[in-house]
Amino acid sequence: FDADFPAGQITCIAGENGVGKTTLVRVLCGLAAPSSGTITLDGQTTSRRQRRAACALVMQDTGRQLFSDTLEGELTIGASDASGEAGEKLLADFDLAHLGERHPLSLSGGQKQRLVIAAARATGRRIVILDEPTSGVDARHLDSITATLRRIAEEGAAVIVVTHDGEFASACADQLITLTPTGATCAREGDPQ
C-alpha cells in the first residue's frame, strides 16, 4: 500500500468491513507499527512517537475521548490556547456554546462528536484523523462538519477521514482511497469516477 496524504487536503478512506481501515488509522497515528514498509512525514521516516505527536485522532466512540468535566476543558486538553474567548468561539463554531456548563458525557452522540472534532481542531496538529466523524450527527450538522474539516485543511493540516458514508465522502474529499481485500485504489478530485 502506497499513498500520500497531502497537507491542505481532505483524504477519505472507504471500504468494506474488515479490509484494514482501522488498522491503517492505527498505523498512521502511531498506535501500531506497520507490518512492513515505512511511514514518512516531510520525506523523513517517522517513529510511532513522532506520528503520535503529529496527529490528532477523533475516534468513532467519542465517549472514550472525553476526560474533562466541562466543554471548555475538553478543548484545552492538548491545546492551552483554546480557553477563554478562543474556546467560546470554537464552541460557537460547532453549535455547542448554548450547552454552557453541561458535563461532556451528558451530551447527545452528535454533540459529543462535534465537541471531540472541535478539540482536535484546537490542538493545531499537522494531521487530523477522524474515524466515522458523521456517526450520530444529524443532517442539520453534516454541512457544519464538512465546512469544519475544510477549514482545518485550509489551515494546512492533512485531514484523513475514514467513512462508510459515500455521500459525505463525495461532498468533502479531495482524494478518495478505497480499500479492498486485494488492494487499494485512489481517486483525486477531478479524476473520472
Name the predicted role of every residue range.
Residues 84-99:
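Conserved ABC ATPase "signature" region
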Residues 138:
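ABC-family nucleotide-binding domains
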Residues 29:
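Helix-to-loop junction immediately C-terminal to a conserved catalytic motif
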Residues 37-53:
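Conserved ABC transporter NBD signature motif
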Residues 128-131:
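Catalytic Walker B motif of ABC-type/P-loop ATPase nucleotide-binding domains
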Residues 103-107, 111:
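Conserved ABC ATPase signature
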Residues 14-16:
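The feature captures the beta-strand-to-loop junction immediately N-terminal to the Walker
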Residues 120-122:
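ABC ATPase C-loop
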